[in-house]
């Protein structure tokens, strides 16, 4: 079993073994920030499409009187390279989406397919997670049973609390301390030790590379599980902050949105079970993170303690994604008015809030005297589908997982009424039980193609080419799925009536995201050729004066830097 795992992750294993070489390659390129760029600030506006930026920058009929509605992003674009053909990861879930940005790799290399996925070489957690993954046995150095891997809010001590239930933490101070090791899947090959998020990712990250080269690093996100950004060993981040986005909403004294709205008392009392359930409350959640980022720009840590301005830092915004996808029963529907991506009033407000927040961030960079030597990258982990909400169809009754309910592990099966559920949004990612024929399962799905509104199905060579050959045998990847199904555009397998969109799939609306790379010394430029969010990673390390090959995934996959950045930097 140990041999199997070494073979299937050969690229990652070799990269880890060459840690000294990696450090030397980084050092050979010079000290962090030895060139023009001293800092890189990375912002992910989750859900924001390339067309969202186009519309808000130019204006669109029927919205805001036809006038532009993102003045700060539009101003940023005047000294930025705009990559209009950017694609996110596939699957386009947040977990692999962020992994692509910070590693330069795809799921076959990083091992991150979804926040809730499957690994045939691990065993279940000791206790049931907050999202329903049951605990189970683990025999040290024995044969693994395989398990669903839960890396969302379920690994928190208490995901109803903004601090994730972190022992002794302040009310708003979520982060690594929020992780309950009893909620983590276990690795029998290491004596059943819990697999922390930073050890779940197979490759190093931009944060671990910059940290190893002497740079101070920080990241802000939505779950403690996104601390995978620290990279293997967990030492790549000096400051990680992740207030739990799926916690109960509380008042936030001293926090106000960039639009000037105070967050105490609670803005929307009708939806307090999660920050993601309300157009208003999600802005306060993001404002809390912006406040932490502003502290970091000022040379403090996220709590205001003494630190230094990071060489590499950033955060994600949730508000646009919520504005795109939520149907708030007591308020109204978000999303779009038409296929041209004209936003509804609710989505418009979220875009304006994020834009105002970015204005605050830029002003803070200027106030700290570091704007000129900061490279600012604005992109998105994923898009959202469908933009044309009339095409939205949520079907939780006939999905690939329900059709194959007896052929997939019980932890993934819809037949498990108290379990965490299948990995299905506007994509279905399927891992089969040991011994189940892939060809037979595919034939079954084809028999129900009209029921599941089948778009495309990937298995065998069509899957292995980009995702490795998955399976239980030596030489097969224990994490790679057996089958991937993408439905017709607009169809999601969630069955949700509180959503009017989703992501995870391969559709254009899922994957064509905003990408701006900006610096005050840049000349505005539009690049129309296709690029990927994975190219952000080598672009960042190169801008900071380090070698792109210090990134494991770059060496393995050959990921290139984004075009034109270096030319703009040296002009």
Show the residue positions of the predicted features.
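Loop/turn elements at helix/coil->beta-strand transitions in domains of secreted/extracellular proteins
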Residues: 36-41, 79-83, 109, 137, ...
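Short, structured active-site-proximal loop/turn typified by the sulfatase FGly-forming signature C/S-X-P-X-R
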Residues: 53-111, 216-218
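Short, solvent-exposed turn/loop segments enriched in Gly/Ser/Thr/Pro and often Arg
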Residues: 82-102, 220-230, 316-318, 554-561
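Catalytic-site neighborhoods of secreted/periplasmic enzymes
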Residues: 144-149, 153-189, 193-260, 551
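Active-site neighborhoods of enzymes that stabilize oxyanions during catalysis
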Residues: 173-186, 199-204, 414-539
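Active-site His/acidic residue clusters
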Residues: 223-224, 228-239, 300-353, 390-392
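Metal-dependent active-site segment of extracytoplasmic phospho-/sulfohydrolases and closely related
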Residues: 352-395, 466, 540
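Acidic/histidine-rich catalytic neighborhood
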Residues: 373, 380-435
């Amino acid at each position: 079993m140990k041999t199997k795992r070494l073979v299937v992750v050969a690229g990652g294993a070799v990269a880890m073994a060459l840690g000294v070489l990696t450090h030397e390659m980084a050092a050979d390129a010079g000290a962090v920030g030895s060139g023009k760029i001293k800092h890189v600030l990375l912002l992910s506006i989750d859900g924001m499409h390339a067309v969202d930026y186009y519309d808000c920058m130019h204006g669109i009929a029927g919205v805001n009187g036809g006038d532009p509605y993102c003045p700060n992003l539009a101003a940023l674009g005047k000294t930025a390279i705009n990559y209009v053909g950017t694609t996110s990861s596939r699957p386009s879930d947040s977990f692999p989406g962020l992994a692509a940005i910070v590693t330069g790799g795809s799921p076959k290399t990083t091992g991150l397919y979804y926040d809730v996925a499957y690994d045939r070489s691990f065993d279940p957690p000791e206790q049931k997670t907050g999202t329903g993954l049951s605990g189970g046995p683990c025999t040290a150095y024995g044969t693994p049973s395989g398990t669903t891997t839960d890396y969302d809010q379920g690994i928190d001590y208490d995901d109803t609390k903004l601090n994730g239930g972190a022992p002794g933490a302040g009310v708003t101070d979520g982060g690594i301390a929020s992780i309950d090791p009893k909620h983590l899947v276990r690795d029998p090959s290491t004596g059943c030790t819990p697999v922390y998020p930073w050890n779940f990712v197979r490759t190093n990250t931009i944060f671990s590379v910059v940290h190893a080269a002497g740079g101070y690093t920080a990241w802000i996100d939505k779950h403690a599980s996104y601390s995978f950004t620290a990279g293997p060993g967990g030492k790549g981040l000096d400051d990680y902050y992740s207030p739990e986005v799926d916690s109960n909403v509380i008042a936030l004294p001293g926090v106000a949105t960039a639009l000037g709205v105070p967050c105490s008392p609670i803005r929307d009392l009708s939806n307090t079970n999660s920050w993601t359930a309300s157009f208003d409350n999600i802005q306060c959640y993001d404002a809390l993170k912006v406040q932490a980022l502003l502290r970091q720009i000022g040379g403090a840590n996220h709590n205001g303690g003494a630190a230094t301005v990071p060489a590499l830092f950033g955060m994600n915004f949730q508000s646009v994604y919520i504005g795109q996808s939520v149907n708030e029963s007591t308020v109204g529907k978000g999303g779009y008015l038409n296929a041209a991506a004209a936003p509804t009033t609710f989505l418009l407000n979220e875009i304006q809030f994020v834009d105002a927040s970015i204005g605050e961030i830029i002003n803070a960079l200027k106030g700290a005297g570091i704007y000129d030597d900061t490279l600012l990258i604005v992109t998105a982990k994923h898009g959202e589908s469908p933009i044309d909400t009339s095409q939205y169809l949520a079907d939780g009754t006939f999905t690939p997982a329900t059709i194959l309910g007896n052929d997939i592990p019980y932890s993934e099966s819809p037949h498990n009424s108290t379990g965490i559920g299948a990995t299905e949004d506007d994509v279905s990612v399927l891992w089969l039980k040991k011994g189940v024929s892939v060809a037979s399962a595919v034939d079954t799905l084809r028999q129900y193609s009209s029921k599941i509104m089948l778009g495309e199905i990937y298995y065998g060579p069509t899957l292995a080419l980009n995702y490795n050959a998955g399976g239980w045998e030596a030489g097969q990847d224990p994490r790679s799925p057996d089958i991937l199904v993408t439905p017709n555009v607009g169809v999601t397998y969630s069955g949700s009536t509180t959503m009017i969109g989703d992501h995870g799939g391969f559709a254009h609306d899922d994957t064509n995201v905003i990408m701006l790379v900006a610096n005050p010394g840049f000349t505005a430029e539009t690049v129309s050729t296709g690029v990927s969010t994975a190219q952000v990673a080598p672009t960042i390390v190169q801008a900071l004066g380090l070698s792109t090959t210090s990134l494991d995934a770059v060496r393995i996959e050959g990921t290139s830097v984004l075009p034109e950045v270096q030319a703009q930097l040296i002009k």
